[in-house]
């Protein structure tokens, strides 16, 4: 079966296509892909993984054409990012000129 394993940093992305036998787990596919050698900072014990954007367990069996994604940890609070991106509201009771 042909599958893909992907990982992305802000400055570098990797998409590896590999052939695996039926019954291969997510963890086995990641290990076989060699991506752990390219990105030694990946820690499968702490980082989440998914298939096509949906969380997956390391022992889940992959299917033909699957795209396994290794997710980086969140380093910024999403609420902080949203707050920074939102336009400032006028002060309560204030008037605009």
Swiss-Prot record:
InterPro entries, sorted: Mopterin_synth/thiamin_S_b, RnfH, RnfH_sf
Gene3D superfamilies in alphabetical order: RnfH-like
Family: Belongs to the UPF0125 (RnfH) family.
Cross-referenced HAMAP family: UPF0125_RnfH
Protein name: Protein RnfH
Organism from which the protein derives: Paramagnetospirillum magneticum (strain ATCC 700264 / AMB-1) (Magnetospirillum magneticum)
